[in-house]
Amino acid sequence: MPRVTVTLGLALLWSGSIHAQSLQAGAWSSNGSAAGYVMEANGRATDPDGATVSLQSQNAAAGTFGSAGSSLVADAIKGRRVSVSAELQTRGVGTGASLWLRIDRNATMLMMDNGVDRPVRGDSEWTRYSVSLPVPDDATMIVFGVLLRGTGRVVARNIRVEAGSPLTPGGPLADPAREVLEAAIAIVKQNALRRDEVPWTTVEPRVRAYAAGAQTSADVYPAIRYLLSELGDHHSFLSPPSQTTALRTGSVRNLDPEVRSMSDGVGYVMVPGYQGWEPSALRVYAGQFHQLLDTVRASVECGWIIDLRQDVGGNMWPMLAGLKPFLGDAALGTFESLSKSSPPWRAGAGVGVQPSSSLAVLESAWVAVLTGPRTASSGEAVTIAFRGRPRTRSFGLPTAGLSTSNGTFALPDGAALLLTTAVEADRTGRRYGDKIEPDQLVENDPAKGDPAIEAATQWLRASSTCRAGAK
């Protein structure tokens, strides 16, 4: 079982950042991972002509997203399937645009489909798009909208919400659907970190009821997502076959790390998230990371800033391999499951790229680590890797709170469960599993530039005294 600390699970949470309780029924609200998106909305999805919504990025990075959302009370649609449909027009969309749909019970998400596994990209003319989910009898709200990831513009017109036929209680499942559902339930029961906290006598019958009548494996995905939501770890998720294939083949688009020397003699390293498991791509990433460090190293006299504030997660191993010059061969942490501790994990494990000897000096360099609310999952694993390192201090804001580890479990149809199976512990044995507080809290204040970088720079210059050892 590959162990990958991932945050593709954030794809399930993105649109969940719009809270149904904050919306007036039928009204539209915008949200996202960062500033830089503009929303325009007209009409309601229940109007005869539907609604029209546009989202446009303005100076948005490839790893960010903008979301528009609306909601309806679920009372009139309980016990039926609900569909949200629209026509999408895109311009210059690099990462993807889609519709999303979420079913809530009070303040808890029951199930969701955000369409990230079937994005509309590039320039397209009025592509028909729809998402559909069953509405359980205990649902209270239906939340839905438009999602734009990365750069570009999307217009969704004729957005409509429609109730379908009643769900068939106890309807038989076709073999492909049954095989996937049974495999998912068994995997969760045997491996989930919080499996003992699930009221199985209540939850399992609901899962099977939500999957009733399913004919294809995709038809049971909403039921599986509901099951994962009942774990309450906020990190487990289902990766459909197309998304799983993209991760395994290295076809996911990733941002490059940024390495540069600042004017005050401090080195700056920005580590973004990294999605993918393909071995040769991991080696290329780590090797290029080392080359960037080697190019800048000689001009750095006062220590280094490792900026993890945009590290939304993915695969922790190439990130640690790229940062191995700072981390060396030390034991950095462990994965703590219900029954055992993993062997200590180390930088470079599973990637197979060693930094050049010219970078050995960085192992004793002064390092300031920056964190924030978008530092998530594998970004938090990297944060933990620096805990207990000499000459190191962290600055900024608390992390996202996903400092747990996911194992990858294949399903019969090519999909995969990325299931939370352990919490993470640092080299001193301290266990996490929630938000990680920085050593020095620094609030964001755009009017004052970047206070976290300023605080980190002041500490580096005072601590390292800009000696040769700071390199």
Language model: regions and residue ranges:
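Short acidic catalytic loops
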Residues: 269, 292-313, 369-370
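Loop/turn elements at helix/coil->beta-strand transitions in domains of secreted/extracellular proteins
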Residues: 264-266, 299-304, 329-332, 363-367, ...
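STAS-typified acidic loop motif
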Residues: 261-286
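Gly/Ser/Thr-rich loop/hinge elements
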Residues: 313-370, 404-410, 421-427, 431-432
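Terminal peptide-recognition signature
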Residues: 184, 227, 269, 306, ...
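Extended, small/polar residue-biased N-terminal targeting/export presequences
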Residues: 195-264, 465-470
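Bacterial N-terminal signal peptides
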Residues: 5-17
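Extracellular and organelle-lumenal recognition/adhesion modules and their flexible linkers in secreted
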Residues: 21-172
